[in-house]
Regions:
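Short, charged recognition helix plus adjacent turn
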Residues: 1-4, 40, 58, 68-72
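Short alpha-helical DNA-recognition segment
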Residues: 21-40
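Alpha-helical residues within the helix-turn-helix
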Residues: 18, 29, 58
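DNA major-groove recognition helix of helix-turn-helix/homeodomain DNA-binding modules
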Residues: 32, 51-66
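A short, Lys/Arg-rich alpha-helix, primarily the initiator
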Residues: 1-19
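Residues that mark the N-terminal boundary/hinge immediately upstream of a DNA-recognition element
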Residues: 12, 23, 49-52, 63
Length: 72
């Protein structure tokens, strides 16, 4: 996970999770991470590692490129 702030990717993840009707806990369970990790992503404190990135995008029906280019 990167430690650089990622406000735009945080917004994309949060809005996609809400649009999917998932709570942070439900998303964490589907992704196999803690709820704290989801909060970390949604606060923009960091981004998922590559393996979690693709799984997260699959669950939320978003493109990895949207997250990777959001804060550049």
């Amino acid at each position: 996970m990167s430690t650089r702030p990622h406000p735009e990717s945080a917004r994309i993840i949060r809005e996609a999770r809400q649009a999917a009707g998932l709570t942070q806990l439900e998303l964490a369970e589907k992704l196999g991470v803690t709820i704290g990790t989801i909060g970390y992503y949604e606060r923009g404190a960091g981004q998922p590692k590559t393996d979690n990135l693709f799984a997260l995008c699959d669950i939320l029906h978003i493109r990895p490129a949207d997250l990777l280019s959001a804060d550049t």
